[in-house]
């Protein structure tokens, strides 16, 4: 499971009804490194976490000591699909990029029998990472 997330620069502090010039100035004053770091953690780090485990996942498949095939799960965010940048443009963009990468991996990893999935929980979702992990590691594997 690849899970990471920082928001990066946000619209916090921008007055509601700001002029276009004020809006542009607010965005222009963001630290570009903060914006880039958001992608480095939310997208790049999640991708390389998956890459780091590919051979181990393949060994698990070849061992065949469980019914299901190996899979990778990346935690994205509902913000990846939201047109309103509630957590900021870098956050939404980085989480959308993570979704797309996992979709591409879902196709690329087919010959190796490794599944690739992405979860995109929202703020009040029952599918938040902690909840999902509790289901994955429950003795009876039930979802309430």
State where each predicted segment sits:
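Hydrophobic structural elements of the Rossmann-like NAD(P)H-binding subdomain
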Residues: 1, 73, 116-119
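Short intrinsically disordered, low-complexity coil segments enriched in acidic
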Residues: 1-8, 144
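Catalytic loop of short-chain dehydrogenase/reductase
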Residues: 5-39, 51, 55-111, 123-125
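A glycine/serine/threonine-rich, flexible loop-to-helix segment
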Residues: 14-18, 120-144
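Structured catalytic cores of enzymes that bind and process phosphorylated ligands/cofactors
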Residues: 46, 85-87, 137
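Short, highly charged low-complexity linear segments
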Residues: 110-115, 135-137
């Amino acid at each position: 499971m690849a899970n990471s997330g920082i928001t990066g620069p946000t619209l916090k502090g921008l007055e509601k009804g700001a002029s276009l010039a004020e809006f542009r100035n607010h965005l222009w004053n963001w630290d570009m490194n903060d914006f880039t770091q958001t992608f480095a953690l939310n997208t790049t780090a999640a991708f390389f976490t998956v890459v780091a485990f590919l051979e181990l996942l393949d060994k698990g498949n070849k061992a065949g000591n469980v019914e299901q095939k190996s899979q990778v799960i990346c935690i994205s965010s509902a913000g990846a699909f939201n047109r309103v940048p509630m957590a900021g443009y870098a956050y939404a963009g980085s989480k959308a990029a993570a979704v797309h990468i996992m979709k591409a991996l879902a196709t690329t990893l087919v010959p190796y029998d490794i599944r690739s999935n992405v979860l995109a929980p929202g703020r009040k979702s029952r599918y938040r990472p902690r909840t999902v992990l509790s289901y994955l590691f429950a003795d009876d594997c039930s979802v309430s």
